[in-house]
Curated annotation (Swiss-Prot):
F-type ATPases have 2 components, F(1) - the catalytic core - and F(0) - the membrane proton channel. F(1) has five subunits: alpha(3), beta(3), gamma(1), delta(1), epsilon(1). F(0) has three main subunits: a(1), b(2) and c(10-14). The alpha and beta chains form an alternating ring which encloses part of the gamma chain. F(1) is attached to F(0) by a central stalk formed by the gamma and epsilon chains, while a peripheral stalk is formed by the delta and b chains. Pfam families: ATP-synt_C. The keyword Transmembrane helix applies. It is a multi-pass membrane protein. InterPro entries: ATP_synth_csu_bac/chlpt, ATP_synth_F0_csu, ATP_synth_F0_csu_DDCD_BS, ATP_synth_F0_csu_sf, ATPase_proteolipid_c-like_dom, F/V-ATP_Csub_sf. GO terms for molecular function: lipid binding; proton-transporting ATP synthase activity, rotational mechanism. This is ATP synthase subunit c. Keywords: ATP synthesis, Cell membrane, CF(0), Hydrogen ion transport, Ion transport, Lipid-binding, Membrane, Transmembrane, Transmembrane helix, Transport. Gene3D superfamilies: F1F0 ATP synthase subunit C. Belongs to the ATPase C chain family.
Amino acid sequence: MGLIASAIAIGLAALGAGIGNGLIVSKTIEGTARQPEARGTLTSMMFVGVALVEALPIIAVVIAFMVQGK
């Protein structure tokens, strides 16, 4: 049962991160197209946002390993 729960947790975290990253990047491209002079600021903010979104799947993997180890 723990193996199935781990797989579901990792899969949903990866799905959410993929959707979140897609939204972040698309809005950054949209903002750059509207205001090209803000490209540097938008890009740096995009990388911060992507890093925060990617932290959740990493935490999910750690928790999944903890559930499997019990």
